[in-house]
Amino acid sequence: TGVQVVAPIQLDALHPDSSGRLSFDPKVVYDQYNDTFLVVYLVQADSPRLSLIVAVAIPDATASNTGTWCPTSFPGDAFPGSPRLWADYPGVGYNDTRVTITTNQFTFPSSTGRFRHSQIMTIEKTGLYDCTQPAPMPTVFGGTKTRDTNGFQSFTLRPAETVGSS
């Protein structure tokens, strides 16, 4: 309805792992399948080296009650076998059962970071949207799995937001 229901909140206040660290690149989508807003943002620190992807599910019906919000964090460098990398340029998409988050992966430190590869993280909604459920375990693709048909590394992938019954 366009009416503000909650006062502005700093990103680093949405999840305890964000506190006192650089929180950036927020993305917000409305998941019509579950009547839930999803806020995704990144957290990064050079010392000690840290990279997180934070997702906060906000049920539309109870959005004014921040106690019903469900924050979850994932390692920003979740691709197995990868050197320590930090995530940047997130993209967010969803369908009726999963949320997909894409990022570009850079080397530390951030001031001289070099692009390594794109990362695709797909997560079942159950634990992501309901904090009474066990934390979800994402499926992650990166490295050679995110190359284009010519063998080049993809850059800034964007997952789809599906609408409708299929």
Positions of the model-derived regions?
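C-terminal PAP-associated
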Residues: T1-S166
